[in-house]
Amino acid sequence: MKLARVIHRDGTPWYLSDDTEINPDIGTVVQVERKTYKFSGTVAYVVHFPGCVGVKELEVSAFNRYFEFL
């Protein structure tokens, strides 16, 4: 896993895999896993937020819009 931080937000909450929602502040540090789907080769990032059980999976372009690696 790598660390990243939130660099942009538009105010709309994100829904996590456990049906909770989060609206993190800019600067929030998160853990990130890279996931590659075997069938298609598509790459996604799975974002783990502090204090949350659920995760948010984002395609690379969406991840790059909202996060930067530390």
What are these language model-derived features?
Residues 7-63:
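Basic/aromatic-rich interaction segments and small domains that mediate binding to polyanionic partners
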Residues 1-3, 68-70:
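Short intrinsically disordered terminal tails
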